[in-house]
A protein has these predicted regions:
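Short N-terminal helix-initiation segments at or just after the protein's N-terminus
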Residues: 1-2, 34
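Hydrophobic membrane-insertion alpha-helices, especially the h-region
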Residues: 3-23
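Intrinsically disordered, low-complexity regions enriched in Ser/Pro/Gly/Gln/His and often acidic
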Residues: 13, 49, 69-73
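Short, surface-exposed ligand-recognition loops at beta-strand->loop->(often short) alpha-helix junctions
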Residues: 58-64
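Structured, soluble extracytoplasmic/luminal domains of envelope-associated proteins
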Residues: 69-113
Length: 113
């Protein structure tokens, strides 16, 4: 019995470690967007002064962004301040980011510099 508990505990610990590394190392802070995390595997399609559009297969207009991405955003100190359609507004201090999730496309817009 003790061996089974140890084995299950080890498997859970390894699973948690894998989840942590896969989730938290899949995103990088964006200098342009005040350190807001951006998926490493998202491809920049178009960039303007206050906005960037990424091609990202995990983005969905119907389901938004994956829960792992939400967790990373929250862990970096960004608070969700509202939703409007496909837009979700995040705030950290006096900085606001509008994240728009559409099918296979992620758009980030900063409120002001």
């Amino acid at each position: 019995m003790k061996k089974a508990v140890t084995t299950v505990s080890a498997i859970l610990l390894i699973g948690a470690a894998i989840f942590y590394f896969v989730t938290f190392f899949a995103y990088i802070p964006s200098d342009k967007f005040f350190g807001f995390p951006v998926p490493k595997n998202a491809n920049l399609v178009k960039e303007k002064k206050r906005a960037a559009i990424y091609d990202w297969s995990k983005a969905s207009e119907e389901n938004g962004i994956p829960s792992g991405y939400k967790l990373v955003i929250k862990s970096k100190g960004w608070k969700e301040r509202g939703r409007e359609g496909a837009s979700t507004y995040y705030e950290k201090g006096n900085k606001i980011i509008d994240l728009i999730a559409q099918t296979d496309e992620l758009t980030l817009i900063k409120d002001k510099d």
